[in-house]
């Protein structure tokens, strides 16, 4: 699984530990790619700015992770849904925000 999120999420073990315990290998972006994702999140997306170049950068990072074995891309940042939609993506995507909502609705 490709894990894309803030540097805290990608460098930390919160998601990675859960996935590892379930037998899922987690692939994270290279350090320079993590810096770029962090910049996109905090300088653009959190301010409502969605640039085509940033979408392209995001998709490039996702593709790099997929080539390393991350067959599904986990959007583990609430803002990444502004860049890619799990229902229209060219590759398998799980948006953690949408997954939380689905789980809460299923619980109801």
Feature-to-residue mapping (PLM):
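Non-catalytic structural scaffold of enzyme domains
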Residues: 2-108
């Amino acid at each position: 699984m490709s894990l894309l999120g803030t540097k805290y999420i990608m460098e930390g073990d919160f998601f990675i530990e859960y996935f590892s315990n379930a037998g899922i290998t987690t692939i994270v972006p290279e350090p320079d790619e993590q810096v770029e994702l962090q910049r996109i999140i905090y300088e653009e997306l959190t301010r409502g700015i969605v640039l085509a170049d940033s979408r392209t950068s995001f998709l490039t990072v996702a593709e790099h992770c997929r080539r390393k074995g991350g067959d599904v891309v986990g959007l583990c940042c609430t803002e990444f849904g502004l860049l890619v939609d799990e229902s229209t993506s060219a590759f398998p995507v799980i948006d953690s925000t949408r997954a939380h909502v689905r789980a809460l609705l299923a619980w109801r």
